[in-house]
Amino acid sequence: MPLRRGDGGDGRRTFELVDTAGADDDLDLLDAPHPVLLGGPHAVPRGTTFPLPPGASAPGASGPGALPPGAPPGPPGAPRVPGRRRVVAAAVATGVVVLVVGGMLVVDAATSRDARERLETARGAVRALDTAPTEQWRAPAAADRGTAFLPGLLVTVDGDEAVALDLDTGDEAWRVPVGGDEAVCGSWSPWERSAVPSRTVVCVAGSGVTPSWYDVSPPPRPREGTATVTVLDARGRVVGQRQAQTAGALLVPGPDGGLVRAERMGEPGEPSGAPVAVDPGAGESVDGVAGRDVVVTLEDAATGAVRWRRELPFQDVPWSCTSWDAETGGEEVDPERLLLVATETLVDVGGCGVAASFLPDGERLDDPDAPTDGAVPLAGGRFLVDADRQGSDGALRADRVLDPDGTPLLDVPGEVLDPQATDDPAPGVLLVRDGIALRAYDEQGARLWTFDGARVPEAVYVVAEGTAVVGTASTVVGLDALSGEQTWSRFVDDLAGERGHGAVVTQAFTDGRCAFLVLVDPATGASSRVVALELSSGSVVWSEDLDGGWGGLLPVQGRLLRWDGQTVALLG
C-alpha cells in the first residue's frame, strides 16, 4: 500500500494510503528519466533510510513468533488464532503502523528542511508568508558604502567600523574598526543579488576610497597612497589585515575573500572611434578618443597573493568615453573613466575603451573581440552574454546563455526574460521572448514549449512550484512550466485597487506557494502595495499597502527586508 504525497500548504506534506490490490508494479518506471523543472516537486534522495520503531526487528530477523525457514503459512479460513499468536500479530501490526508513521514523519521533516534550505538560497525566495507581513524590527543601517551577507548577518559600514546586525532580531552582533572613515565593505550590484551568504567580508579603507559603482560626473579619481584591507569572519574576528598600495588603482572587495584591483597602464594610443562634438554651438569636435589600457588583478585580500591578472587593451566601445555636458549641450570626453563591480560570482570592469566580464577564477565570459558585449548573471548561476550591453556597433550577433562554469548553452533566439524570484537555486527552465511568443528551453537548450498569447510578454516575475508568473503591459498570467498552458490571468489594475490605476510591478518574491508582487504607482512612486497570488490558481491570498515613503524590499537568506537607505527593517 504505497504513500501518495500531497501538498498540505505552509510547506507541509500530507500522505494518503492507496490500495493497490490487483495492480501490477512496473519497477522499470522507477528508473525512467524525469524532466527537471524550476520549482518542481522535490523527492526524498535515494538511499534515505528510516529508523525502525523501538522493539521492532529488521526483516528476516529471528525471535519469538518467527516462522521457521520454509514453514508454510496457515491454511485459509483458520477457525482460530491462539491468544499468544494474536498478541504477536497485534505487536507486529503495531510495529508496522509505527514504522509507516515514523517513516512519514522522517519524510516530512526531510522535505521541510530541504524546502527551507532551498528558500534560503534561491533568488528572490522568502520564508512562508501566510498573511500580510508586519515589521518585526528596525535598525539604522546605511547601504551607500556596500553591504555583505554572512550566515544570519547583515554587514554595513558606520563611520570607520563594520557593523553586523542579526537578521532575525535586528540586534547588533558585532562592531569592528576597519582602518578609516572612508571605507567600503562588501559589494553592490546592479543585478539581482545572490542569496548564498559569503564566508568572510572584505573591507577597504583609506583616503579617497569611494564606492566604484557611483557613476557620477566627473567620477572619483583613484589616488596615490595606501589603503587598509581587512578581512572579517562571521564572528567579527579579524582573520587578515594589511596595507595595500593604491598607486592610482581602483580597489574593491572581491569574490571569496579576494580584492580586485583595476588600473590604467601605459600611454594613450592613437585616437579611435567617431568624431565627438564637444561644443556644437561653437562647432568644436575631437577626432575620436585616445585612451590607455587597463589591467585587472584579483588578489587574496588577506595576503596580497595574486590569483590572476588580465590585460585589457583600449578598444572603441561606443559612448563609453563621453557624457552629456549640460552647459555646452555637447559631449564631455573622459578617457580615464573606469568602473568596477565585483560580486561572489562575477568581476565586471567598464569605462572608457574597456568592457570585460570574468568568473572568479579569471575566465573571461564575454568576447574579447566584441567591444559592445558584456555578461549579466541569471537565476541559478548561469550567465547571459548580452551582445549589445555596451551599445551597438551595427553587427548582428545573438545573445548567448552560459552555464555557471562559462560553457556555452544556447544562442538565444530572442530576449531572455530572467525570473526575479524562484523557489529553487538550480533552475531547469529558461524563458525567452521571441516576438510576441514566449518560448521555454530546458537545461540542455532543447525547446520545451511555445506560448502565443494575445499580449506581448514583458517580464517573468516568478517561476516556482511548476508555475511561471509572466507579466504583460496590463496583466499577470500564470503558465504551467511543463506545458506552457495558461492556468490563470489577472489584470494589474484590479490587483492594485483604488490607489493604483496604471500601477506597474517593480519587484517579485516567492515562498514556493505564492507569488508576492510589489505594485507601484508610476506617477508618484511614494506608496506601493504587495499582493500575494496563489501560484496554482492566481487567487489573491492577501494584499497590503506599504506606506512610509520610499523603501526597497530585499530578500536575504529567506527573510524579507525593507531598506530606505538609512534604516533596515525585517518584515514577517
List each model region and its residues.
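Secretory-pathway ectodomains
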Residues: P2-G572
